[in-house]
Amino acid sequence: MKLNKYLFLLSAVLLLPINSAPEGAFTTLHVKAMDVAKYVDFMKKNTQPFEAIGSDVAGVCVTRSGNQYPGEMFVWNAYGSIEDAFIASQKYDPMTPNKQFEKLRKVKYGVTWKPVKEFELRPGYERLWRLKLNDWRAFAKKMEELESALKAAGHDMRLGVFYPLGGGTEVFHLRAVTDTASQSGKVADEYFAGASYGKIWDSAFQYVDEIVSETVEECE
């Protein structure tokens, strides 16, 4: 399996028009890479671990701003269900000593994620907020409203809200994804200039108790 081989198929699943949370789940393995470029290149050339766990789609996100430590990044895998994601976590233990990987990265932790709003899986330039929410359903609804308003304003920004499962101290994730940094910056500029969709963003924060952190990532 090549990274992102089944991207279109999984995107179709996550975009099904249903009232409950969309299907699918993700896992992330957070690491400290000794050399980010070398680690990513190694994974692209050695896809056996991804094939072994049976993920539908796989990729990486590299933290570019707001880092908690040098070389901060994670490897993500997408599945058709939480069940599949949980089963996959039993097939591969990243904590097991591996001489090849030990030279390239240090494992921090792993998490399973459930998307709680429709989300088009098209990685790119991504702003990530780690949030403590008091009503995740209401917050997700606000993000649906905001995404529609952004599209009406001519912006191609995909918003994802993700519920952590077995994540230790992890909290909810909000991702705002664009194809380029320029597109993301334009949305932010318009917000501070008083764009009407900014009111939806501001209103959504009644459901946020705390912004734990905010980072910028480049994903593929």
PLM regions: where:
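Sec-dependent N-terminal signal peptides
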Residues: 4-16
